[in-house]
Amino acid sequence: MATTITPGIVSDWTLEVAAYTDGTTPTTFTRVYGITDFTPPAPSKNLEDDSDFDSGAWGSQTGTGLSYEMSGTVKVPRAGLAVDPGQEILRLAGKSVAEDGYVHFRAIKKGATTGYTGIADASFTEGGGSRTDLTKAEFTLSGRGELADYTPAP
């Protein structure tokens, strides 16, 4: 018997950020609004070849480290209009280095009981285009340390 799966939608994700605070978890996070495209965080493994002559023709790999990245695109307000506070945290971190370029983040799907939290190095780049294109920016958050589970308050 086939089971029907009702798919989720990418717009179920919510991203919240906070300026980096020397590793101390902030008490206040700011939601990033205007997201039009989002790739949630997912661990990827660094694999190293650990095969030897005894394995014959078969190779073997083992994971030696984990990393993660998330990215997205946001609509950017016109000049002179109010900026989105969450986007502003990403923009300021995106033009800074070392600790000033880090942000705390939380990412969770609507209706989910757990999400992700961590610290990431941020990039934020406004895009160009033709005269009729909307102003958008791309952001990337590259993980620094553990991608931890996050349980939101009920």
Task: Enumerate the language-model features and the residues they cover.
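Acidic-aromatic/histidine active-site loop/patch
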Residues: E138
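Extracellular/virion structural assembly segments
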Residues: S55-G118, T132-T135, G145-P154
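Solvent-exposed edge beta-strands and adjacent loop segments
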Residues: A2-R78, T117-T135
